[in-house]
Regions:
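Conserved core of the PLP fold type I
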Residues: 62-190, 207-208, 212-224, 230
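Walker B catalytic acidic pair
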Residues: 203
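The start of beta-strands in P-loop NTPase/AAA+ ATPase cores
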Residues: 165, 196-198
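A general structural signal for well-ordered alpha-helical segments in protein cores
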Residues: 46, 50, 71-72, 185, ...
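N-terminal small-domain helix-loop-helix segment of the aminotransferase-like
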Residues: 2-97, 104
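Short glycine-rich anion-binding loops that position phosphate/pyrophosphate groups of nucleotides
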Residues: 39-41, 171-175, 237
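Conserved core segment of the aminotransferase class I/II
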Residues: 52, 222-263
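Residue-level marker for buried hydrophobic side chains located in beta-strands
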Residues: 171, 199-200
Length: 263
């Protein structure tokens, strides 16, 4: 029997130092609006998560922590349950936030002035990981095809030169919500292989799919893609816990992992 959760009771988060509702005066000059600018929800987190946090608070000491086996095991179990994939523990790398992960990868795998391909419209903080690290953002606008968007591989080809080193992909795409198919991701894999590009993919919204659509993780496309892949994700969108600072990278290539550890 599946656990049922309450999506009817909306929590009033005003006057709680809420990054969504309590910043409206400063940002927009009014509180009389519905704020849709931040990707969190006004539903309570699952009771299992809240109970676990209560146990820590009831213990009373909020000291330094270390990564336990449970951290790695929870990710391994999730990928097994969702995708029937066995993820080796050593592939998993902790990172506080995906925005930090993307910035670390840009610093690690590229040099100042290098080009990084990213589809637009794009999630601002991922763009900043390129621009604030003094790299060149190679903008590839998505093409509208009927009711959905597509990647324009011909346009991407036209931008590549010897200084192009990486692609940053949102899968599913933010903000359009487009869920990339396996066939499209195979094209991405071929493109990155042909041009020797590192692929960073943000899959934080992968669990939030509309009925009838299944998330295609980049980890389950081709072995060649995995050799140049850094996948970043987090439980924060899935379980509505963005205030809990936790994310992770999955990096199958040992050489790429070691380079990240040095950074």
């Amino acid at each position: 029997m599946e656990t049922q959760y309450d999506f009817d009771d909306i929590v009033n988060r005003r006057n709680t130092n809420c990054g969504r509702w309590d910043t409206m005066d400063k940002k927009y000059g009014t509180r009389d609006m519905i704020h849709l600018g931040v990707a969190d929800m006004d539903f309570r987190a699952p009771v299992e998560i809240r109970d676990s946090l209560h146990k820590i608070l009831d213990m009373g000491v909020l000291g330094y922590t270390d990564l336990s086996d449970k951290f790695f095991l929870s990710i391994q179990r999730w990928y097994k349950k969702q995708y029937n994939m066995d993820i080796p523990r050593e592939w998993i790398v902790f990172c506080p936030r995906i925005n930090i992960a993307s910035s670390i990868c840009v610093e690690t795998y590229t040099e100042k002035g290098d080009g990084i391909i990213m589809h637009t419209p794009a999630y601002g903080p991922l763009q900043n990981s390129i621009l604030k690290n003094n790299r060149k953002m190679l903008s590839s606008p998505l093409k509208k095809n009927g009711e959905h968007y597509e990647m324009d591989f011909a346009q991407m080809e036209s931008m590549v030169d010897e200084h192009t080193k990486m692609m940053i992909l949102c899968n599913p795409h933010n903000p359009t919500g487009r869920a990339w198919t396996k066939e499209e991701l195979v094209q991405v894999a071929d493109f990155c292989r042909e041009h020797d590009l590192i692929l960073f993919t943000d899959e934080i919204h992968g669990d939030l799919m509309k009925a009838g659509v299944r998330h295609q993780t980049a980890l389950d496309v081709t072995e060649e893609m995995n050799d140049r892949l850094i996948l970043a994700s987090s439980p924060t969108k899935t379980f509505n816990i963005p205030g809990v600072i936790v994310s992770y990278m999955i990096i199958p290539n040992e050489k790429l992992r070691k380079e990240i550890e040095v950074t």
